[in-house]
Regions:
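Long, intrinsically disordered, low-complexity Ser/Thr/Pro-rich regulatory/activation regions
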Residues: 97-117, 121-122, 126
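Extended, well-ordered protein cores
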Residues: 1-64, 68-97, 120-214
Length: 214
């Protein structure tokens, strides 16, 4: 990961003066001091891991390359996987966080040029709500792949890998659920201040400060 340090914004989380990219402080974790600084940071690196998942299969099959530690890659905490947990009712916002997000959305809606969409809770990428949502998504994806393999009766080498479950399962179903539950293309369940290094976003040419789903 050291090779990516130069492209990660210096305004994000840092350890020993080094930018660490898609990794965010969470107040639920031990604080520094007495804990070490890194103990309060949740690492995601969604896009980096997505890239790894994408190139590993062809490189393994066509070039016979072995990737050590590939089992340490995690589920991807993005809006199709995380949104599925919300759309299926597994996760809900706490009432005080919901109200805080709605208030933030209404305040932001007063900015000229914002799109006219339904009122939904709005948070910045570093907000504990978003960090915890993404972290919980990673954890539940591990549980989900085990459950899917169990329900399908798959054992040993026949078991689906996490990457296979993500591509054909949670990511696919999350995308379908999103399309079916929301009646128009840009409809959203939770709004996120624009951070291009965190999520892949849809953006019109005249946007200056827009908000998008995780």
């Amino acid at each position: 990961m050291d090779g990516f340090a130069s492209i990660w914004p210096s305004s994000r989380s840092q350890v020993d003066g080094q930018s660490i990219g898609d990794a965010w402080v969470c107040s639920s974790l031990p604080t520094s001091p007495p804990a070490q600084l890194w103990e309060s940071i949740v690492p995601f690196h969604k896009l980096t891991q997505w890239l790894c998942y994408s190139i590993m299969v062809p490189m393994s099959k066509l070039m016979n390359i072995h990737f050590a530690g590939s089992d340490l890659l995690t589920g991807l905490p993005e809006y199709r996987n995380g949104g599925l947990l919300i759309d299926m009712g597994l996760l809900t916002l706490k009432e005080d966080d919901l109200q805080r997000g709605l208030n933030a959305f209404k305040e932001n809606a007063q900015i000229r040029g914002q799109p006219n969409v339904e009122v939904v809770p709005l948070f910045s990428a570093e907000d504990d709500v978003i960090v915890e949502w993404r972290a919980i998504t990673v954890g539940f994806l591990d549980e989900l792949v085990d459950e899917v393999n169990g329900q399908l009766g798959l054992l040993g080498e026949d078991q689906l890998t996490l990457a296979q479950m993500l591509e054909a399962g949670s990511w696919k179903v999350g995308s379908l659920a999103d399309n079916q539950l929301r009646c128009w293309f840009d409809s959203i369940l939770i709004c996120l201040f624009l951070f291009r290094a965190v999520v892949k976003l849809q953006r019109s040419p005249d946007q200056t400060q827009k908000n998008h789903r995780l």
